[in-house]
Amino acid sequence: MMRNKDKSQEEDSSLHSNASSHSASEEASGSDSGSQSESEQGSDPGSGHGSESNSSSESSESQSESESESAGSKSQPVLPEAKEKPASKKERIADVKKMWEEYPDVYGVRRSNRSRQEPSRFNIKEEASSGSESGSPKRRGQRQLKKQEKWKQEPSEDEQEQGTSAESEPEQKKVKARRPVPRRTVPKPRVKKQPKTQRGKRKKQDSSDEDDDDDEAPKRQTRRRAAKNVSYKEDDDFETDSDDLIEMTGEGVDEQQDNSETIEKVLDSRLGKKGATGASTTVYAIEANGDPSGDFDTEKDEGEIQYLIKWKGWSYIHSTWESEESLQQQKVKGLKKLENFKKKEDEIKQWLGKVSPEDVEYFNCQQELASELNKQYQIVERVIAVKTSKSTLGQTDFPAHSRKPAPSNEPEYLCKWMGLPYSECSWEDEALIGKKFQNCIDSFHSRNNSKTIPTRECKALKQRPRFVALKKQPAYLGGENLELRDYQLEGLNWLAHSWCKNNSVILADEMGLGKTIQTISFLSYLFHQHQLYGPFLIVVPLSTLTSWQREFEIWAPEINVVVYIGDLMSRNTIREYEWIHSQTKRLKFNALITTYEILLKDKTVLGSINWAFLGVDEAHRLKNDDSLLYKTLIDFKSNHRLLITGTPLQNSLKELWSLLHFIMPEKFEFWEDFEEDHGKGRENGYQSLHKVLEPFLLRRVKKDVEKSLPAKVEQILRVEMSALQKQYYKWILTRNYKALAKGTRGSTSGFLNIVMELKKCCNHCYLIKPPEENERENGQEILLSLIRSSGKLILLDKLLTRLRERGNRVLIFSQMVRMLDILAEYLTIKHYPFQRLDGSIKGEIRKQALDHFNADGSEDFCFLLSTRAGGLGINLASADTVVIFDSDWNPQNDLQAQARAHRIGQKKQVNIYRLVTKGTVEEEIIERAKKKMVLDHLVIQRMDTTGRTILENNSGRSNSNPFNKEELTAILKFGAEDLFKELEGEESEPQEMDIDEILRLAETRENEVSTSATDELLSQFKVANFATMEDEEELEERPHKDWDEIIPEEQRKKVEEEERQKELEEIYMLPRIRSSTKKAQTNDSDSDTESKRQAQRSSASESETEDSDDDKKPKRRGRPRSVRKDLVEGFTDAEIRRFIKAYKKFGLPLERLECIARDAELVDKSVADLKRLGELIHNSCVSAMQEYEEQLKENASEGKGPGKRRGPTIKISGVQVNVKSIIQHEEEFEMLHKSIPVDPEEKKKYCLTCRVKAAHFDVEWGVEDDSRLLLGIYEHGYGNWELIKTDPELKLTDKILPVETDKKPQGKQLQTRADYLLKLLRKGLEKKGAVTGGEEAKLKKRKPRVKKENKVPRLKEEHGIELSSPRHSDNPSEEGEVKDDGLEKSPMKKKQKKKENKENKEKQMSSRKDKEGDKERKKSKDKKEKPKSGDAKSSSKSKRSQGPVHITAGSEPVPIGEDEDDDLDQETFSICKERMRPVKKALKQLDKPDKGLNVQEQLEHTRNCLLKIGDRIAECLKAYSDQEHIKLWRRNLWIFVSKFTEFDARKLHKLYKMAHKKRSQEEEEQKKKDDVTGGKKPFRPEASGSSRDSLISQSHTSHNLHPQKPHLPASHGPQMHGHPRDNYNHPNKRHFSNADRGDWQRERKFNYGGGNNNPPWGSDRHHQYEQHWYKDHHYGDRRHMDAHRSGSYRPNNMSRKRPYDQYSSDRDHRGHRDYYDRHHHDSKRRRSDEFRPQNYHQQDFRRMSDHRPAMGYHGQGPSDHYRSFHTDKLGEYKQPLPPLHPAVSDPRSPPSQKSPHDSKSPLDHRSPLERSLEQKNNPDYNWNVRKT
């Protein structure tokens, strides 16, 4: 490896003349060196080993060295170049060269020997001399067409083969030019790295700036084209490259992985000529040189299966045909995609073998459609940027050292491809795209140099000119071929006049009259006539976006229009290249077209521009002035507004006012005034309203303006139901008898559900009960079954047969997508060619389906459409027949559908057939709806062509049901009585009728000019024969029968009996059902896991089916409480789910409804509706939680058991909601909401004030970035990182979500950081007292999620008394590290945690020594105070909650300032720095142990560093005599030390003391041998039990068995082990407390334990038993003792021992009380310890911490004697038990000092008993158990 590197260096210096360019490109390619070398080695098949090794040696710098040099030494070894260097290097080079030549296999270099056939990419510079054949693969495009301006000039293979290493550069360029495709035949030097580079170029990152950083290039490259080049190394047989092995430096490794191309997609397959693969098969290569597989004869030539591959990072134009063999040789990535493609192909082949020829034909047509799309992707739609190779050194595909002037200046263009989003843009060579798409390049340059760009100086913006009418169409509109119709020119004049008068207006022409063209003409008029160049903003629905784009190109090509849609990356690309001129900072575009959704997502960007014109298509989306879309758009700065809608009035005058208020807020300011003026207008036909509207609204209808439009004739075809439909219809009514019988007392939604079911039944039986698979056999039977299941389909079948014969083309509309599925199946079986458009068909496919149907000579016979899909602007005028299969609630919706065919351009009469099922709800709905439509037409002639509902004057009601309960009841009864007269099973089939007879009976009349709006509306329905006035009177006078008269009793009874049976079954099945649902709920985490979604889905569907018959079913026990559907009217379940998801992202969500609406895509909903839903969720959750808590109080066992921690769930409509997660999120984000200022100016200055731990990201990250991140979360919602990234005000664009996914911070790191910052905020607000009262309670509830173990050590260590505080948290993930870093969730933090834990253990070993003297002195005082402790307890609780305190012997507790935390002022820091200089080396090494150390060695390393540092600090402190000074400087110095590691000062100090103690113990053990242990020196982390004794004497003096011996620990037991007492009596020493020892254990265990049996540090295998230790002892006095145990750094609010139980997840808690309660009840079965045999612990294996031999502890065997202080603790714990048995000796007496354990406990020689107790106090104990 080194040799190769040296060789490269030598060459590098020998090529000094090219140094500058070479270095630049080397940066870009340095990490690719391995791959480069490999490609260059293969560059010259004929040059022999010399050239081979030469290229190899140059490999690492192939990009950087001038190929002219290599040409000179074409066949020479590297030797000559090396001569200039010292001999040793020369020898090494020669040595390497020789080895490469002699043992190519060893180094994987063998390829170099063979002429490696590089895919012959289209060689642009072909005609260049050998020098021009430089090996630099230019960008794929460049490579291909570099110099050769014509595609035709691809060099012959011979020529290519002549390219020796000297000529390899150009060749590489070729290679690079197009997506590298392996071409066996043409040996080409593969410069792998170059493809990458090329990729980088293509990246949209490469801006057209002249000087992109070279070092950025490699990143871009890797990202952009993962390893393209693989495809070029054709003949690689070896898995490893020698180059990679040899040259592997750190970077090389990454690059090596990038050597190969990646398959992105397999597009097609074929049988092709063997070897006709690779670069020669790209589109442009075939155009230039012909298809290598063109003369393939399957009979004579050898063939192979080939696949059309779209390569990752290359555009579609570079797709190549490859065989499996060629792909494997190139070692491409993504072969799994090929396997999947082959599998799918096999399935299709099998299917094609079984189906009829017509099906095969249909399949082939579909394939053709798909391949047409792929061809479209090879067409450049627009060029958006240019760069020359010179400007992007290091990013181009040809080497920077190339001397060729042409390539260095040859431009590359960033191309947007037709039909693909901007994110798919790619850089292409001019030579490649210039040939075919020169017009795109020209238009790009003309746009770039255009002077017609928006400017604020335009006079017309400030002062409108006088209006001059256009008498004829101006020349700038549409050129010579396009002509505006008269009424369109009139419309243009009206728009221009309004603009001159400063009136914003509504263009409300009927659909089909060309509103789009009139608007574009108006913008062109402003552009040309008044030099107003924009910016114009046009907001349109997605469905009409392409037609707007197309019309702009046709009618106003001079206007630079940008279509602003796509994903985040696409929009970023648009803003980077299409937005502003980098020099002038002026906007580039004149008009911007976008959609409502994108407008809301990027409202900050779009809202910052001053728009000269704002146009909104389909403007009835703005009818709700309370919706987010409305509120957002009305705030946009615009000089003129135009609303384009065919339906200005939908449900009420309020909606008309909303539109008027939007365009002219000053004139139509208040709805109340408008209503007062015009609300009563129906008496005079709204004449006053007409007058007011006149200047602001223009509406023409087709029959007024388009005399040439052929007639439209509508016929209603009434059909009978089939026998099966009749059965189903009766069955639906009978099953719902109870709901129906309630009449007006029933629920509207219940009735609507029944109506919908009946409407489905009228359409087709399969909508009610789909057929079983096995019921459907051959095609003919399927067809018959399909047709017989619907009376409408029987008629349609006959109708279509007739229409097909006549050559008509048909549009078939249905509201129900499932009905469209059935019709599609019918048409497929009948082999009628058709297209389909519904909501699921998007974008390009939709557009292509429309184009295909409208194309000249199209064979499509039918077009299936969803009545509401596709927006209004869809033109299907090539059809002349419309079939309305099922009518909408509102027939006007169907008028919109008809207008798709009956519009301008239609030459034939349009026949409309409306199918209605006779005697059913369908017929009645049409009749009633028709009558309700009349009022609408009195205001604006036939304005409602899409109205979902019927006009009601003042109600803003916009739900989709226009009927009230009474009407719904009447509709349901219509026809039912006659139906039930037919006996069950005897339903008659509809009579066979001739289609001509049917059409004759449905009397046909043409549209006539109506005398009134009402007549005109009604004339839409040619139904005079079917619904005469008498019928209507009859309808009104029809006697109202009750349902029990309509539905025969026997059928009702039959259904009731079935229901009863079903209920009985349910009762039997209940336990099973309950357990399964319970399981689903309990095991869910709070996050939206898949299982939860499934549960929600099932519950949603359950509720949908059960809502209507809830009365009939027994309520299931345990079912979540649910909120009725009608309480969330206007929201679907999917919308509610989205709302809840967004609700959890914001603080105080009820005040952030607009943000929630935007996030949940509910912008059409009014704020009132959103608020109603938000309040419903909040209130339901709060009450559910209260109920749950009450239940827990009543029945404590309810909340126990696994899975119960999840808390209650509720159901809102069909959506199941976890109450706890909602409330938790509300609390978490409330703090953020409170801390962010409301004032926008203040908000910009917002900065975190608390100290924040550093974030270890790959970018600079400071407190400002944290503050901006919080601001982003506040503005855009938690988790919406992409929006935060793109918000320019936050300035985080370059910092978060880097494109390289291995860089941080990605989403996961941001989430972790955000969680940490939110916790800091909460702490900060607590401190400030901002949180009071109820909020404090909330915080307590949340606390279980925040561990603050660090507070424990602090009190102990600094104040000498072990003051307990209950644990703050049971959440393992937030232990310890949360306080420091908040990054507890990331894997790195886990490692840090381990390290920290390890060190804590060491620390704790010695942490008692300093305080021992204090403790001993205070014991006697504590004894006196002890009896008061009971009284003190309650008061201390309240005090404790305020924070840690100093406790001194003679005074009240003094609070410790929490902010004395870990920061030093500059002066103190400098002093500390100087004092610690002698141990600088230890400080640096503290957190960086050498790599390769094992666990034990790492531990020793850390311990030694700490000891050096701690000893130095102790030395520094000797200078002080005053205790206060000593404390202060000890603290300062340790804080200084903490800057070198992740741990805080307290932890480090504690770790040092533990290590110090251990050291002194080990020294003592060397001197003394314990006679009990037989001279062995057991490792004892604790010197004695004195720490426990001191604890006992402090906290339980009144119970002490030997009160007269306060210092007893000094002389008992431990002496037996030879630990001198002075260790414990020394004033500066103190012993372990339980908590400390627990920390020590945990730290040791978690640092070195995970799976590692490292003897000295114990094992983590035993924790499963520790849980049982609790069970073996009474803890009656537990609460009393708690106050004196567990470390002092924990929060002191005792009251929160089990705070808010139900709020914690089940793994967060092992409730202490559970154990206490259980074991009190258990006492009968358990013997107290006094009555157990001495070796009980040894026998009871549940209590044993380990059963391994004790060889782990410095090789010592088991100890027969355990330390006597265990018995102290035993005595202490036992004292709540009954009085000691007289026979039992005092635990402190000498006989008792023998350990009850005969075998040594691996847990630091402590009994499981004391460990269990201490661990119960230790916040980390549960953590251990859980983790284990």
Swiss-Prot record:
GO terms for molecular function: ATP binding; ATP hydrolysis activity; ATP-dependent chromatin remodeler activity; chromatin binding; DNA binding; helicase activity; histone binding; RNA binding. Residues 1464-1566 are annotated as: CHD1 helical C-terminal domain (CHCT). The modification Phosphothreonine is found at residue 240. Residues 175-204 have a biased composition (Basic residues). InterPro entries: CDH1_2_SANT_HL1 (IPR040793), CHD1-2/Hrp3_HTH (IPR056302), CHD1-like_C (IPR025260), Chromo-like_dom_sf (IPR016197), Chromo/chromo_shadow_dom (IPR000953), Chromo_domain (IPR023780), Chromodomain_CS (IPR023779), Helicase_ATP-bd (IPR014001). A motif (DEAH box) lies at residues 617-620. Residues 15-75 have a biased composition (Low complexity). SUPFAM superfamilies: Chromo domain-like, P-loop containing nucleoside triphosphate hydrolases. Its EC number is 3.6.4.-. Residues 261-353, 378-456 form the Chromo domain. Residues 795-946 form the Helicase C-terminal domain. It catalyses: ATP + H2O = ADP + phosphate + H(+). Residues 496-666 form the Helicase ATP-binding domain. Residues 1584-1601 have a biased composition (Polar residues). It is found in: Nucleus. ATP binds at residues 509-516. Interacts with MYOD1. Interacts with histone H3.3. ATP-dependent chromatin-remodeling factor that specifically binds to the promoter of target genes, leading to chromatin remodeling, possibly by promoting deposition of histone H3.3. Involved in myogenesis via interaction with MYOD1: binds to myogenic gene regulatory sequences and mediates incorporation of histone H3.3 prior to the onset of myogenic gene expression, promoting their expression. Belongs to the SNF2/RAD54 helicase family. This is Chromodomain-helicase-DNA-binding protein 2. It comes from Homo sapiens. The lineage of its organism: Eukaryota, Metazoa, Chordata, Craniata, Vertebrata.
